[in-house]
Amino acid sequence: MLTLASKLKRDDGVRGPRASNPASDSTRRVSVRDKLLVKEVAELEANLPCTCKVNFPDPNKLHYFQLTVIPDEGYYQGGKFQFEIEVPDAYNMVPPKVKCLTRIWHPNITETGEICLSLLREHSIDGTGWAPTRTLKDVVWGLNSLFTDLLNFDDPLNIEAAEHHLRDKEDFRNKVEDYIKRYAR
């Protein structure tokens, strides 16, 4: 089977140094992204948190993959949460697009899958947003941390969930457990 990594190695050997060609700018941008992804995916797989699994439906498309987070502590322990990660052509100048595919009761994730994680923001006033020095490993570790130390009730995206926690922590826990039973097994 031809993988993206072997194709890129083969293509570099055939083409040699690239000449400047305006017609190939968009192709070159995709190639830059794909070359970065070959390295980053290898690093990611070597440094994956023990509570995470990655799945590449097509090994030749490293720009699209799924992440499963299975928290082993806290409110979300026992759940299996699926995320879809799509890396745009302009990567690493812009962050990957991430969506939670599992319905969840969480202050930083909406029930429709939008995610509040500062490193996924293209522009951030506090300097914690996306930067070209960040990698897929940072994204995966950040998503994993949303279930533990980055769980943030003070700056929520899902205001209703955060207010629920503030009002009645035990009822919040019960609703989280109900969502896990219904949607995250």
From Swiss-Prot:
GO terms for molecular function: ATP binding; NEDD8 conjugating enzyme activity; NEDD8 ligase activity; NEDD8 transferase activity. Residues 32-185 form the UBC core domain. It holds the Pfam family UQ_con. Keywords: ATP-binding, Nucleotide-binding, Transferase, Ubl conjugation pathway. GO terms for biological process: protein neddylation. Residues 11-30 are annotated as: Disordered. It comes from the Eukaryota. Residues 1-29 are annotated as: Interaction with UBA3. Pathway: Protein modification; protein neddylation. The active site is at C116 (glycyl thioester intermediate). It catalyses: [E1 NEDD8-activating enzyme]-S-[NEDD8 protein]-yl-L-cysteine + [E2 NEDD8-conjugating enzyme]-L-cysteine = [E1 NEDD8-activating enzyme]-L-cysteine + [E2 NEDD8-conjugating enzyme]-S-[NEDD8-protein]-yl-L-cysteine. InterPro entries: UBQ-conjugat_E2_core (IPR000608), UBQ-conjugating_AS (IPR023313), UBQ-conjugating_enzyme/RWD (IPR016135). One of its GO terms (cellular component) is cytosol. Its EC number is 2.3.2.34. Accepts the ubiquitin-like protein NEDD8 from the UBA3-NAE1 E1 complex and catalyzes its covalent attachment to other proteins. Together with the E3 ubiquitin ligase RNF7/RBX2, specifically neddylates cullin-5 (CUL5). Does not neddylate CUL1, CUL2, CUL3, CUL4A or CUL4B. Belongs to the ubiquitin-conjugating enzyme family. UBE2F subfamily. This is NEDD8-conjugating enzyme UBE2F. It comes from Gallus gallus (Chicken). The gene is UBE2F.
